[in-house]
Amino acid sequence: MVGWIRYVLGLGMDVVLNLHDEYKAILDMFEKQQVTYPVKAFFGELLERPRRTKAYPIALINQNINLDQLLAINNAMKYPLAYIQGPPGTGKTNTIINTIVTAFFNNTTVLFASYNNVPIDNVFEKLTHLEYHGQTIPFPVLRLGNIDKVKAAISYINRLRNQVQTVKIFTSTLDKRKDDRIDRAKRLSARLKEYEEILDLKERKETLSHLMEYQEHIKNAMNLLPFQMDLQGYQMQRLDQRIHQIGEISDSDALQLLDRNEEEFYQYLFYTSARYIKTLEEPKYQELREILDSGENPETQARAFNKYMQKSENVKKLQRVFPVIITTCISAHKIGEPEPLFDMTIMDEASQCNVAISLVPIIRGEKLMLVGDPQQLN
């Protein structure tokens, strides 16, 4: 079933990555029958459609979004697997950013990875430059990677620690509209489910139309007459009735079910983010603080940080401060042991990452969102 993986080598330009630990972890998953949905799908073992989970409130940092993008975010949160494809200019990056913010809002940890630095740097740049009342929101996202990226990450963490020192957190005010958000989430989820059904119905209707056109070309074949009558008189009619029953759904219909109080949401992001960063000052983070405050040369600090991150238990502790971690597919192997450490892995430009290397971030997530161009994503 997966015996062939021992022969897969991960090559990335001049980088050779030893994936022995990843392969062993996958084999252990299968032996213990604890295989995640993403790994099942990777090896063609996902033989039935995964069930939906609960409805998650969708949280947006902007309103530059349409129904298809909302559906992508909704499905990424509700299903263990989501495949998002679209050509350049269709809002894939905006969808990724809003998915990450939605995940953060729902206490979901995220590993965002790509084979290339550019897409993940763009997302990191946007997430770290959100503002509330002229102040930068200390959004708890960490960019890791090679030794230089880790040096920058250590400096960035210490800047955030200094920034939030004087911020007072009033926890009771942060969740005062939680029930309203949950109710909106349920209604939006139901509406998006109907929109998804309409897309499916229209696709089936188009297929039937092509079949009927084909029948016209061979209408002399009497043995096909009952089939043609079934298409025209029953199946097409049922599709039309259901489409009419649901009705048209516009972008504005869905947006009305979102929390559109941007001022209040940015306030929530600011203070909730600050609360996450302040967690780093708790006693259980002493080992990490010693690395951050060591005063040693940056390279020594970075190597100590990488050593700290090799242990899964330390990664899980860090996630309580930085629930969103961004890195390349190759550098993801430095994050803990090869096991599902994150609630969700998001992989951008998915097909540009070779098959072997893609396993590194995939194995570290309970769920998977693949994003790419139709000309690239297979």
Predicted regions: what they are:
Residues 67, 78-99:
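Walker A/P-loop
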Residues 1-75, 150-176, 288-305:
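Pre-P-loop entry segment of helicase/translocase ATPase cores
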Residues 69, 116, 373:
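Short, conserved phosphate/pyrophosphate- and ester-handling motifs at nucleotide-, phospho-/glycolipid
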Residues 48-49, 79-80, 89, 117, ...:
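Short, glycine-/Ser/Thr-/acidic-enriched flexible segments
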Residues 83-85, 104, 109-113, 368-372:
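Short hydrophobic alpha-helical runs that function as membrane-insertion/retention elements
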Residues 99, 106-111, 115-343, 354-357:
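Alpha-helical nucleic-acid-binding subdomain
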Residues 64, 73-81, 102-106:
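Phosphate-binding P-loop
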Residues 330-347, 351-378:
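Conserved helicase motor core of SF1/SF2 NTP-dependent helicases
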